[in-house]
Design a protein with these regions (language model features):
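Membrane-proximal, non-transmembrane interface segments of integral membrane proteins
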Residues: 2-78
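Soluble C-terminal extramembrane regulatory/interaction domains of multi-pass membrane proteins
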Residues: 62-188
Length: 188
């Protein structure tokens, strides 16, 4: 059977998302490109999900690596930071398409009635490659959100610092060094 033609037009842009994209610094043309790219990526992720439901070994792969959740999380992080599309280029233009291609071929070969030892060896290599790809996607996703994690970590440390009671000792007398400091040093 032939693949169904995709609709050339994208759904209308939600006003909140339009505002988000504009606030991210994207021009009208960049918004169109981003939306088209993300629509293609979403379709690829949906196809990967469908394949994982059809082939038990692929389902096991996704369960062991959290692949589907990882793909969705990376997609969502990219939607939240559309100006960073180039930072996620490997994910968008290489990793997901290559993973999808491997999964489609894997599913096709898995459904063959007769398999030889070479077939099983090839399937094992493909499975190992897909597992490694999932690990690489995880590593790249963690690098993509690292700034967000660093910001959160800084905020948590600051909040903890404000929660701690101030360490003052009422009975402590100022030392000569404290009294003798020029005022400008105490301010800075």
């Amino acid at each position: 059977s032939r693949p169904k033609p995709k609709s050339a037009s994208l759904p209308s842009l939600d006003p909140k998302m339009a505002e988000h994209y504009a606030a991210s610094g994207l021009s009208e043309e960049e918004i169109k490109l981003f939306r088209k790219t993300m629509a293609d990526l979403a379709e690829q992720i949906r196809t990967i999900e469908a394949l994982t439901q059809q082939v038990p070994k692929l389902r096991a792969l996704t369960l062991n690596t959290d692949l589907v959740d990882l793909l969705h999380a990376y997609f969502e992080a990219l939607v939240q930071a559309p100006q960073r599309l180039t930072d996620a280029g490997t994910f968008v233009y290489q990793q997901v398409p290559n993973l999808l291609d491997l999964m489609q071929k894997y599913a096709q070969i898995t459904h063959h009635e007769v398999k030889t030892a070479d077939t099983y060896e090839t399937l094992d290599k493909a499975f190992e490659t897909m597992t490694n790809m999932a690990g690489k996607i995880r590593t790249d996703y963690q690098a993509f959100i690292k700034d967000d994690l660093d910001d959160l970590d800084s905020d948590v440390r600051l909040a903890k610092k404000h929660l701690e009671p101030e360490k003052t000792h009422e009975t402590e007398w100022p030392t000569w060094a404290m009294i003798n400091k020029p005022i400008w040093r105490m301010i800075y």
